[in-house]
Amino acid sequence: MSCRYAPDLDSPDKFWDFLVNGRSTVGDMPDKRWEPYASGSPQATAAMRDTVRRGAFLDDIEGFDAEFFGISPREADFLDPQQRFMLELAWEALADAGVPPLTLRNTDTGVYAAANSNDYGRRLLEDIPRTGAYAVNGTTLYGIANRVSYFLDLHGPSMAVDTACAGALTALHLARQSLLTGETPLAIVGGLNIMSTPSLNVALNDAGAMSPDGRSKAFDEDADGYGRGEGAGVLVLKRLSDARRDNDPVHAVIRGSGVFQDGRSDGMMAPDGDAQEHMLRQAYHRAGVDPATVDYVEAHGTGTPTGDREEITALAKVFGAGRSPHAPCLIGSVKPNVGHVEGGSGITGVIKTVLALRNELIPPTLHDRPRTDVDWDAWGVRLVGQVQEWPSCGRPRRAGVSSYGVGGTISHVILEESPVPAATSSADASTGVRTPALFPLSAASEAGLRALAGEAAGWVASRPDTPLPSVGHTLTQRRSHLAQRAAVVADSAEQLVDRLREVAEGRNGPGIVSARTSAGRADDAVWVFSGHGAQWSGMGRRLLASEPVFAATLDALDEVFREELGWTPREAVTEGGPWTAAHVQALTFAVQIGLADVWRSKGLRPGAVIGHSVGEIAAAVVAGSLDRDEAARFACRRAAALQRLDGRGAMVMVGLPFEEAALRLGDRRDVEAAISAGPHSTVLSGDRSAVLRVAEEWQASEVWTRTVDSDIAFHSVHVDEVTGDIESAARLLTPRPPTVPLYTTALSDPRSRAPRDSGYWAANLRKPVRFTEAVRAAAEDGHRLFLEVSSHPVVAHSVSETLLDLGIEDAAVAGTLRRDTDEVESLLENLAELHCHGVAVDWARHHTDGELVGLPAAVWQHRPYWIFPETTADAGLGRGHDPASHSLLGGRMTVSGSPTRQVWQTRLDMDSRPYPQSHGLVGVEVTPAASIINTFAAAVEEDGPSALTDIVLRTPLAVEPPRVVQVVREGRSLSLATRVAEDADADGSEWITHTTAAVTPGVRPAGGRLDTEAIRSRLPEGSLTRADEMFERMGVEGYAFPWDLEELRHDDHEQLAVLQIEPSPAQRATSWAHVIDGALTISAMVVSPGDATVLWMSRSIDQVTWSGEPPARLTVHSTRSLRSPHDTVDVRVADERGDVVCEVVGLRFAAVEHIGAAVLPSELVHEIVWRPWDPEDHEGAEDAPVEQVILVGDPEATVPLAEQLESAGMTCVQVGDSPETGLRPDLFARPGAVVVAPALAGSDTAPEEEAERVSWLLVRTVQRVAEIRADVTGDAPAQRVWCVTSDVRRARDERSVAHGPLWGLARIVAGDHPELWGGAVDIGPSADGIGARLVALLDGAAGTEDVISLTGEGAEVARLSRIDRSADGTPLQCSPSGTVLITGGLGALGLEVARWLVDRGARRLVLVSRRALPNRTEWPAVTDAETRRRIDGVLALEALGVTVRVLALDITDVDQVSAALAPEALGLPPVRGVVHAAGVVNNALVDKVDLEGLREVLAPKVRGAMVLHRLFPPGDLDFFVLFSSCGQFARLSGQASYAAANSFLDTLASHRNAGEHTETVSLGWTAWRGLGMSSNIDTTMFEANSRGLEAVSATEAFGAWSFGDRFQSDYQAILRVVPTPVHTPRLPVFRDLPVSGETDGPTGDQLFTTTLEGLPEQEARERITADVREQVAGVLNFDPSEVEVKRPLVELGVDSVMTVALRVRLQRRYGLELPPTILWAKPTVAALSEHVCDSLRWDGEEHGDLAAPTAAA
């Protein structure tokens, strides 16, 4: 059984609790179903005014799991909710019955569905324009049953039954007959009722059938009609004998049933008690049941006075006769609880009664006072008023259920309690023996699976006494196994609950497997039998006890092994090692054969077979090519022969492809390439000393090696001496053709069908093992599932590597046992892996001693599917608008409760446009402003003479797509709004307000006459063709109203025009639209320059007045307004007599075309270039002669520097490396410079240590000089602080990297202390004449430049320049077979980077963070916002199919990091890419920086980078990206430590690329809006803006990264340059840069679409939507999250200037030509992005990749 009853009773258990607690549910029909009708036409409003709205309504009738049933969203919209309920409830009912639904395929199962209302379907079919093919089946009653038959592929009877309220029991009767006649073996019976519209309420209300309060008061004195109810129930029926045979749960037995018709009674709708009595007597007679043995009758009992009277009379006559008052027949009705479910009510009564039989209790019937016209005692019946026990009375409990329909059909069912005892498991839930078992779950989607796992965990946790075998039996044999699967291995209820909860949380811990089966893969796995190396002491020992088939197989080999080797497999397994290599060879065969038999006993079979070396023997047996006993004898003799080779050889695996390894070895005989173990690994074999020596030599050349545990050199020259013995032993074999595909690893062709004869087995031992080739062949043949049959997985990794190398990512590789791991658990976990990937398992062999239990079968993933047809949504349109009226005033409604509010509604499309001629503006058909103003005029027509004031034309009204239009007047306020007609019923559909205004009654035009002659006399005559030409240039493609320009005179401020109107024949005489249109249109010429190419449109009007009759010929006088002369005009319109009949005051125009700026990726990516230093570039710079240089630093640097300076005539003072003591105030008596000159550290000093030391040296020096200067009173000689660095520019020597931080510090000091700072000078290795050149700089360059480089060519200065694009390369792409490491990976920025890298192909991520995440079991309960954000970020990545490892590491600890990233610890492929994004911000002005704060900031960036540099030296990675900052260039205050750390990264990148490698880049980011370390963006970016920098969005940042990665550069600055404030000079480094947006337009490499190339269309569309949202946010200065994609842009605040800026941005980003009017037709982000998507050209039919943009949109 299954059910849904109001409000949310979604299971029989919940329904039962509801009933026994005597509850009821009644409420109002939901607004969504009521209001479209109640607010419709006046007739509809009147009809519904007194209609009962109350009843029992389900909370959710729109929700449906369409994906589960393979139904598209489009079709689901057209699916009657009753069909949806029937599908879901049929699935649930079958699960309750223990019948896996998918096993019914091709059976004669019948489906019977009772329903008598299809409100939803009727309503959809009324919407003729939108009725499509899906409505054929989706809107019908027959579809309720047929849909289930179609989905489950059932071939028995399938029908809808409509006998009104008797329908459900009629359907049950028909199903029972079909079962008894043998027509069908199983029947699904449903009864349903959904009230999609109030239409039937109106009819029933008019018939007097409904209770005013919506309650059914069955058999109550106050009964006054019935309350309608929604709900559905489904039953599964079987013949009792079949149910017993199949061990199915039997809830109750149907002893009989009957269906009759009352014929011609007092009226078709009138109940007939006599007919009911006759039907009951006939039914019980045919069933052979005495009515006196019936304990309880679930009556129809609707609560109508007449119906209840007739029914109780009939019941009393049949069931009450002869009964004692102490033992009456009990009567009840479920309708007071859940309402009258009409066509489904009979099933509701049956479910209630079955539950009562099962629980031996009868729930109460809700009533206040039983009917007083019934003598209950005398009649032998009693109404159940409270919960009543149901004793058995020595016979089966029996009950009847009655229904009768409004058309006269009467039906009844006789129920009896189940004769089958309640299911009890033979398994003991608490035996104390913890045996692991497998528990599979499945669903149609991942979300559904996780939800189901959570529900199952709760179910088991709440029923701890349920035997686990019964749980397993239910999940394995009583459920269908769907595509999204999980399987859990558990040995206790507690462990099962814990692991199910992990599945619910999306985690795959120990004992948990989850995957989705893939269509098109082979049904069965390829069984792979590995060779030497899987053995371990104790292997198979547990299986001997737990798996009888394993023990039997090993015992069957005893005789052969004892004869040949003197020991048996059982002895070897029981006793354990140590074993010789030869021992292992024979034992490997025995164990593999035993394990293969175990897999077969689990119901598996091989799809193909591969053997590896000795594993080929077992492979041949399993494939049917060899006899088991013959093969066992051969394996023993082979092992005995190999015994002679023990201890003479060795084998080692190396990290090279087979061919490359063989090539390196050349013709050597002492070492050979023996095994092709994987695409990038080979096993070498040969003389022990030679093999070990080769391994050592190759390891020194960075080839990884690993010793193989074997002292026999298999597959090498060593085995030549036993090859003859092997061939001789193999002659006893009788090879046969295999029965399953058998791939060879001994021959060059893996598909060779060569017989497994003696020659083959000699080759098997001597020739190289071509394992990689065999796996590749199997994969090429379509196999995607592989099972390694071994005691430990030794080749599974090689299989995985081979598949990844082929680009196959949907494969799975399972093992069998694992060393030192519980063998039963290991076996089950691997079985879980195979099952979850689609291998067929014979579940009948599992959980054989369990019984069916009530585990949840599905947790539906509901999404709303609902259509409000336009005929319904527009029911209030009334007459609609009259296009000839030139207005959009439609049907009028007065809103209830708001007498001052009036609404007119209509529909606008091309056929109903309120103007006679096409009015195209730049390609868009637009409703003229005149029609909208005329609409308002018509809305206030009843007020008499009026003025429209404060008209705001917010956004133009495009005609296409068709729109629903509403005009609303509330008091004096007017507004006109629309929404797209096809979205009118969609959730989130937004109304767009186009125009607002106010009305002032009693106002007429100022009147008077227009002195046309005086005006003519002062205005020169203009060209009549000028207007047409000008409007054509503007993009006006036609006038909305036909008029001719007869005269035109104008100057720069005034214009006179005479227009002749051509009224259309149907035009209404009261329309002013043609007059206002002519006046507004021609007046635009006053504000438009003569050569204008922009479109000027009306934006607002202060006041419009009119009076009299609209003229056919008008004179329009337009003058620039004195109040706002630039874009505002006052207009007066006169008739032929010269009388002013219309005035337009304060008509403002707006240009819809403007030059805007959009930033392209190419405008954001910059690099450092070096220009010759020219003192003339710094006119006005301080020219203070330097008389003395104070040198601070190490003697190793200051002594030689002093010598060079002194040789140039400079006085030098050396104070050592302690500025606190060395810098004394007396030294500052002469003008001079303080030069910090650290030495290059020795090779024994780490660069990170030295970087910290020299940074602190410079900081202390600046602080000390500032202190001394602050203490000096009066004028003091100028002193500037300089620093000297060694080859930071190129950093060819690693020691130079330590000086890198000084550049960043220098720039920040220049900002914090411009009065103190001189500059930084970098001395290259080829620079000469340093003394004189440095003196010149100290004298003439102080404070002018951040950094000056002295080279052999001269002095050069750093400038930012847009990246050199001459060497275009390939954007960053991650190898799917590698791992990407991200430090700072759990920060907001790190997670964004991770998601972006996934888009670039990354499939395995290691996220390093300082702070650990909680244990996964605690994740659901985490409430801390920051931790929650991190957890959600990881889960989001995993949901994309990415493997994520989160490591809590100190990135500065090389030992900790190297240990964590070791392949064996990480369990992932090698790291191929690194993004170092870790960082700490601790802002402080240079004066306030202390050593502790400096170290804190330097540590993660500097020390962390050096750890990674050493772990991944240049050439080891595909990419190494360092996250730096460009804030240093803007001299941002407080960022001294941060700039120093980032400058170190920049120098490290140069050093890593100094050789032949170019994979490293340091990215100097500007702030990212809303991410990572830019949380202080408001303050930081205020300062940055003033210095020419602006933040970027994440979209812009990633676009820039992707663009810049194509060009080789050690350092790239990602920044947007903006104009600096007036009188603020640009900093030197920015002087060569254009402001962002200064570009000639889009080129191929500038387009945002380049970031989308190769993406599936849907993903590209989603990215475009996000990008358009970003662009809108940019022009609004919003965060993107504040931009609602379906909200009109004008509502968000986008004005005409922003519109143009947005349009230009989009044109440049997408290479499209967008019309200036684009936002009129596409006024939301959703619509705009859809237009952009549709305007791009896509490759492919349905899911093509983005190719290139079209030329125009």
Curated annotation (Swiss-Prot):
What is the protein's name according to its record? Neocarzinostatin naphthoate synthase
Extract the coiled-coil ranges from the record.
none
Residue span, PKS/mFAS DH domain: 886-1158
Q: Which keywords belong to this entry?
A: Antibiotic biosynthesis, NADP, Phosphopantetheine, Phosphoprotein, Transferase
Q: Does the keyword Phosphoprotein apply?
A: yes
> What are the catalytic residues?
165 (for beta-ketoacyl synthase activity), 300 (for beta-ketoacyl synthase activity), 340 (for beta-ketoacyl synthase activity), 919 (proton acceptor), 1077 (proton donor)
* Catalytic function, reaction form: 5 malonyl-CoA + acetyl-CoA + 2 NADPH + 6 H(+) = 2-hydroxy-5-methyl-1-naphthoate + 5 CO2 + 2 NADP(+) + 6 CoA + 3 H2O
Entry keyword Transcription regulation? no
Q: Which GO terms describe its biological process?
A: antibiotic biosynthetic process; DIM/DIP cell wall layer assembly; fatty acid biosynthetic process; secondary metabolite biosynthetic process
GO CC aspect terms: cytoplasm; plasma membrane
- What EC class does the entry list? transferase
Task: Give the molecular function GO annotations.
Answer: fatty acid synthase activity; phosphopantetheine binding
Alphabetized CDD domains for the sequence:
KR_2_FAS_SDR_x (cd08955), PKS (cd00833)
InterPro entries the record matches: Ac_transferase_dom_sf, ACP-like_sf, Acyl_transferase_dom, Acyl_Trfase/lysoPLipase, Ketoacyl_synth_C, Ketoacyl_synth_N, Malonyl_transacylase_ACP-bd, NAD(P)-bd_dom_sf
**Ketosynthase family 3 (KS3) domain: residues covered:** 1-417
Which EC number(s) are documented for this chain?
A: 2.3.1.237
- Which residues are recorded with the post-translational modification O-(pantetheine 4'-phosphoryl)serine? 1696
Domain called Carrier: residue spans = 1659-1736
Q: Which organism is it from?
A: Streptomyces carzinostaticus
Q: Where is this region: N-terminal hotdog fold?
A: 886-1006
Pathway listed for it?
Antibiotic biosynthesis
Q: Which PROSITE patterns does the UniProt record give?
A: CARRIER, KS3_2, PHOSPHOPANTETHEINE, PKS_MFAS_DH
Function as written in the Swiss-Prot or TrEMBL entry: Iterative type I polyketide synthase that catalyzes the synthesis of the naphthoic acid moiety during the biosynthesis of the neocarzinostatin (NCS) chromophore.
Highest taxon listed in the record's lineage = Bacteria
Q: Where is this region: C-terminal hotdog fold?
A: 1020-1158
